[in-house]
């Protein structure tokens, strides 16, 4: 697991390289985290080697839009369309997005939870040229958080007397537990 200060350092290294280094691809290729760049329309124009391992697939330059992953889900397991993902929001809103968690579904069925760091890129005139995104793997942490949420929902369901509300909470607990289990299975099968 990366520490917050190490994550900040990696993000800053990537941003400095993309904004000013003529050899930015070499810098990004050496980063230990999945990193990719899109144009202003969201088409993927570059990805580093770590993206392939993380996404479980080779991204398609110019064809994949907004993200290098196959499918996306919210932190709680609901489907997240690529055009609604944090990278899309960063480009459309022309602002950094921080503090989000998403789950990537790989073609082999395994899942990885991650925190994205999408950051728009601008030319010297202030025009949007694209964005860079780093994906920090938080699978273990997210699985633990989902398990804790499942336990809380189950406890609450057991404590209330309204059967309808208890059933809703039990179903929520089952969903959180299932998503956590899918994440744990992914870490034990191929990390």
Stretches with model-predicted labels:
Residues 15-39:
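Sensory modules in modular signal-transduction proteins
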Residues 35, 44-45:
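Conserved hydrophobic beta-strand signature of PAS-family and PAS-like sensory domains
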Residues 41-43, 53:
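PAS/PAS-like sensory domains across diverse signaling proteins
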Residues 48-51:
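N-terminal capping loop/helix in small sensory signaling domains highlighted by a polar->aromatic N-x2-3-F motif
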Residues 59-108:
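Terminal output helix/cap of sensory domains in signal transduction proteins
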Residues 101-103, 110-116, 132:
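PAS/PAC sensory module
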């Amino acid at each position: 697991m990366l520490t917050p200060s190490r994550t900040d350092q990696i993000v800053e290294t990537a941003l400095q390289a993309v904004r000013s280094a003529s050899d930015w691809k070499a810098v990004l290729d050496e980063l230990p985290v999945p990193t990719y760049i899109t144009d202003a329309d969201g088409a993927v124009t570059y990805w580093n080697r770590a993206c392939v391992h993380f996404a479980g697939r080779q991204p398609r330059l110019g064809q994949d839009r907004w993200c290098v992953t196959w499918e996306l889900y919210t932190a709680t397991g609901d489907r997240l369309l690529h055009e609604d993902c944090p990278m899309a929001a960063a480009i459309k809103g022309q602002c950094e997005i921080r503090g989000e968690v998403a789950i990537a579904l790989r073609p082999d069925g395994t899942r990885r939870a991650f925190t994205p760091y999408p950051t728009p890129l601008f030319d010297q005139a202030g025009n949007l040229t694209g964005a860079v995104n780093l994906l920090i793997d938080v699978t273990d942490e997210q699985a633990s958080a989902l398990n804790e949420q499942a336990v809380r929902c189950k406890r609450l369901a057991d404590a209330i007397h309204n059967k309808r509300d208890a059933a809703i909470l039990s179903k929520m607990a089952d969903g959180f537990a299932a998503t956590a289990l899918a994440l744990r299975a992914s870490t034990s099968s191929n990390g």
